[in-house]
Amino acid sequence: MTPGPASLLTENIIGLEPSFGRGDESYDKIEKQVLNKLKKISGHNQIVRLQGAASFALEIMVSNFLYGKVLIIKTGIYSDRLHDMSLASKKYYKKIKKIEYVDWDKLDKINKKFDWVVGCYVETSIGLKVPIEELYILKKRLKSKLAIDATASIGLEKNHKLADVIGYSSCKGLFGLTGGAFIAFNKLPKKYITLFNLNLFNHLEKKMTGPYHAICSLKGVLNKYQKFKYSVQINKKKNYEKNEE
């Protein structure tokens, strides 16, 4: 029950302006403001913005951060793509050594040590929320790090700061236009991916066109973020009560 990519608000349109992204002081101020607010929402101190869907951000996250033994939590279509990305990364970059794909309701049976636990906070395909607090407890128990697909949870759910790295898009719970994606984290990865578009550092250094207008669309929305978030929560509650009747 998250807002879909088709969401279009007055604030999205008002925020749009001609933007180039390099040597554009007006845009630089907007981007700094938006990224600072996004870091505050997620609780991370570093963020990368890029042009594309959340799946692109997640592929960069998987390719640059994951290594060693990886446990992926199976929840549905969204976790399937994390699994596919991890398999590809294991094949082509050789940093991931082993992958296990385990159903979300069988995690109590996992006792082995992993380098990374990967999963979706909210699995939109079946309307399932796996509390990030429980994933954090699992991470600590398995002595691992936590990577989260926050596509359907960012902006609407709490405690994303419990994850070591997250990936998400500019729409859905952030109420921006489609076309922007973000990776938030606290520590830079040690891995180095040579493919230009999958290299996290190339995006950090802004070596390619960024999601300029998606970011502009977030400027006005994030100023009223709590209002829009509350509206979604009320609608979710009403839909739940209606279905219970």
Go through each PLM region and give its residues:
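Short helix-loop-beta junction
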Residues: L87-K95
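Conserved active-site segment immediately N-terminal to the catalytic lysine
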Residues: H160-C171
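Conserved N-terminal alpha-helix of the aminotransferase class I/II PLP-enzyme fold
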Residues: G15-I60, N64, R81-M85, I234-N243
